């Protein structure tokens, strides 16, 4: 068994956290810093995708921020030194929804994210404001249940980035 390189592991974790910051900031520059040009993002059936390439992924999440006020949290993160698995919450405050899921991340030789596999608890049900595991007490386990406030710097960056994006 190969012993994971702690420095590589730390860079991978930083890249995934920076990816979530890119989503929350709606920042093409931040996406460029962490996603490979040919990154692929796969989704469950009927959820769209796969999205091929960094620009397609950035377009997707910037569109969600613009339309739904989307915000994401990392609720759990596991890294074995080769891949990362994240459990997350995607808040959509403009439409009163949230969805929880998990994703696997792979990385290219340069340390950029080159693959993302999204898994949801169930297919997206538009009649439910919270698509979550049935009977799982998120609040008791200290999961967020409301969209987080963005820190002032990230919020300002987000507004600036959205102002510079063409409207859909």
Residues covered by each model-derived region:
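A beta-strand edge to alpha-helix "cap/lid" segment located at domain peripheries
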Residues: 2-7, 42, 59-168
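Soluble or luminal CAZymes and related metallo-dependent hydrolases
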Residues: 11, 15, 56, 97
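Short, solvent-exposed secondary-structure junction/capping segments
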Residues: 17-24, 33-47
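Charge-dense, low-complexity intrinsically disordered segments
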Residues: 2-6, 10, 48-51
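Short solvent-exposed beta->alpha transition segments
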Residues: 40-61
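Short, aromatic-enriched amphipathic alpha-helices that serve as compact interaction elements
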Residues: 8-26, 149, 153
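An amphipathic alpha-helix signature
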Residues: 28-32, 58
